[in-house]
Structures are given as structure tokens and as C-alpha cells.
Amino acid sequence: MHITTLDIPGLFLITPTPRADVRGVFQKTFDAALFATHGMNTDLHEVFETESHKEVIRGMHFQMPPHACAKYVSVKHGSILDVVLDIRMNSPTFGKHLSIQLSAENQSTLYIPEGFAHGFKALTELAHTSYLQTAGFNAACDAGIHFDSFGMDWGVDNPIMSERDKALPAFTSFISPFSHQE
């Protein structure tokens, strides 16, 4: 397993090391002890899965405190452009975003800590995405930021989106409850 530190502190790309033989493939995709040495929260509470069609955009979502959560995002079928936005006040990367392709082929997982908004665009006809979360869903703390309000070029003119996501507030009007901690 290989862990890559990404350009925004706190984000990690986790890539398994598959071992193949005549039976097929075996690989480790989660290692709580190893992840904890990198400061990742490994106290998992819920797993969600989505199936999305090409040019669907979901996001940008997060949960507010006291039910904020970290996520481990991976793709089981197809491919997505995964996007994260730093919404931690006083962070040197506050307001910066990062995008990375996750796919069934590369088998990578993106670790997203608390204090980030998350979304993605489906790149294939069908993308099956899995989220492991460190807190249970809480409707009262469910929040988001409008997908095109922070400078991300999504590369699609008419994305397929939920009415909820279309109505999310702009990043410029968002007052973050998250703070950066060294």
C-alpha cells in the first residue's frame, strides 16, 4: 500500500499494492494502524455508495460540527473526477481546491479530513462510488457549497444535478465553522 501526501495538507491518496496469482488478485485497501500514523481518522461509522451516470455532478457536500466527518472515497466501477475544497478558516489553503481522478482501474482511495467540501463528476457512463465516513449522517448538519462558485472548471456545460445541489449557497457567502489546526 502506498500513501501519497497531496498538495493540500490533510489530503492523502491511498493506492493498494495488488498481488496477483492464478486465483486472481488480493490486496489490502484499509489499514487503520498505518493510516493513523499519517493522522487519518479511522473511526468509521457508515458506508454510502452511489451510482452516477456520465456528466452527473454531486456536491459540494460536508457535515457541519458537531457531526463533521472524514471520508475515504473510492470507485468500484467506472471513473470520476473527485474534487475537494478546503473550507478550514485560517488554513494556508483556505478556498483552494484539488481535483483527482479516481477509478476502478487505478483502485486509489482519497482520504478527506473534516473541514473540506467534497464532490465529483462522473466521467464514465456508470460510476459506482463508495464513501466510508467517520460519523453517521445527520440531516441537521448536512450542508454544501455550490459546485461552480469557487473556481473549479468542471468541463461540462449542462451537468446532471439534484435540485438540492443546484440550490446550494456560493462559497463567497459561506461562513465556515471549521478552523485549521496544525
Where are the model-predicted features located?
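Non-catalytic, conserved peripheral segments adjacent to functional cores
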Residues: 1-105, 124-126, 136-182
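Conserved metal-binding segment of the jelly-roll/cupin
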Residues: 102-124
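Extended, polar beta-sheet/loop recognition surfaces of beta-rich domains
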Residues: 133
